[in-house]
């Protein structure tokens, strides 16, 4: 399945963050030829799909000489240009898990150019709320700030059963920035990328929270 085939209205409604990541991959011509599995297995630290799928704990079905197995998307890239597939294995399908009712996601990135560029930093968020808009789950995955996707730890303990507020966002931003292990290159310094990761994490959270909140209000009507 090519990336363009993945970009359909049902996905945008169910997992808008994943759809956003798909839509940012290359031009229309590239999207018509590249595959989602290929983007994962290419194992670029700057891949758009990796954080967007990892934050929702998506899985892959892998076929090989020893039969069928499953693994988390986040376990496939093991370093720049390296993946965990064994000889003769390939990805058969990608599984997006069923989501709680008041859940949503988002994906944002920073690029030096506005069009057709790879991410210098990216952030994905998955959030679940209850009817009172208290946070029940909040996951953040960062891209292009380490050899592989960074699934940030220590956030759920901080936010559980709380309303989203500026203080929480600031604390999460600091955690995200300190979780980075980026390189210096022409697209950004270590300090810049670490700072931007915290900023993008806040933006991703606000967007995902708004989408989940909209579901609560829509159902209430």
What are these regions (language model features)?
Residues 1-221:
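C-terminal structural segment of proteins
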């Amino acid at each position: 399945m090519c990336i363009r085939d993945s970009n359909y209205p049902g996905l945008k409604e169910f997992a808008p963050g994943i759809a956003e990541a798909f839509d940012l991959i290359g031009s229309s011509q590239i999207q018509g030829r590249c595959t989602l599995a290929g983007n994962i297995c290419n194992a670029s630290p700057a891949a758009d799909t990796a954080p967007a799928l990892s934050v929702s704990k998506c899985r892959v079905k892998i076929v090989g000489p020893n039969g069928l197995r499953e693994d988390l998307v986040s376990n496939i890239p093991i370093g720049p240009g390296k993946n965990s597939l064994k000889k003769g294995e390939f990805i058969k399908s990608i599984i997006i898990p069923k989501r709680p009712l008041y859940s949503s996601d988002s994906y944002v990135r920073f690029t030096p150019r506005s069009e057709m560029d790879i991410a210098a930093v990216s952030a994905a968020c998955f959030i679940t709320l209850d009817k009172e808009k208290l946070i029940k789950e909040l996951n953040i995955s960062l891209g292009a700030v380490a050899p592989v996707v960074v699934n940030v730890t220590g956030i759920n303990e901080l936010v559980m059963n709380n309303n989203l507020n500026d203080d929480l966002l600031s604390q999460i931003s600091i955690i995200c920035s300190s979780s980075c292990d980026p390189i210096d290159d022409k697209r950004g310094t270590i300090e810049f990328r670490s700072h931007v990761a915290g900023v993008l994490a806040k933006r991703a959270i606000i967007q995902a929270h708004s989408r989940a909140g909209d579901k609560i209000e829509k159902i209430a009507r």
